[in-house]
């Protein structure tokens, strides 16, 4: 007979890293484990369109590093009860902020917030409230710019430090890197393919 398993009330990075590869994606929010299904095709297609354009610009101008593939970042604040690890669909880190090797042997999460975080909404993942909360958390913990991309509505919400809420781009608008990624501009039409 199977024995019942005790689920920890507060998760740590070490516990997150020890989870088996079971086809789900996981994040930690102040010690709380969040489980999400993998994203769908449109999610990957739109993410790739942004990644190519952004990577080309960043490499050409030697601005830093672009990472893709649900990369996890350790956003735990000093003294915070419970670890926080969030994964970004796409992220950019300026050259002068490229993360050092992990502080603990065996961990894969860098202890910084990227300068730019891109989240592509997927019907199988968070709803609007969940992605808004996630974007706010990125900005509150140090990201300089956040883009939440909604493929089904062809809208991008832009999040910036100091703003009470996001602003939405649609139609003929362009994504701009601003001070975070100088000179970067991408028409939304390119994102949708």
Predicted regions located by residue number:
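Gly/Pro/Ser/Thr-rich low-complexity, intrinsically disordered segments predominantly at protein N-termini
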Residues: 1-193
């Amino acid at each position: 007979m199977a024995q019942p398993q005790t689920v920890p009330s507060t998760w740590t990075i070490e516990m997150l890293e020890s989870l088996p590869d079971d086809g789900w994606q996981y994040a930690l929010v102040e010690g709380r484990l969040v489980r999400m299904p993998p994203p769908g095709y449109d999610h990957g297609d739109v993410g790739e369109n942004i990644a190519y354009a952004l990577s080309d610009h960043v490499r050409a101008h030697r601005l830093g590093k672009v990472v893709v593939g649900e990369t996890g970042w350790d956003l735990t604040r000093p003294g915070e009860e419970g670890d926080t690890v969030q994964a970004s669909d796409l992220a950019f880190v300026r050259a002068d902020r490229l993360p050092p090797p992990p502080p603990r042997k065996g961990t894969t999460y860098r202890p910084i917030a990227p300068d730019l975080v891109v989240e592509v909404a997927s019907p199988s993942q968070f709803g609007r409230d969940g992605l808004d909360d996630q974007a706010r958390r990125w900005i509150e913990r140090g990201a300089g710019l956040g883009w939440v991309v909604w493929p089904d509505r062809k809208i991008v919400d832009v999040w910036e430090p100091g703003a009470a809420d996001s602003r939405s781009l649609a139609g003929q608008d362009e994504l701009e890197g601003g001070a975070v990624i100088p000179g970067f501009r991408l028409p939304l039409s390119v994102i949708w393919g």
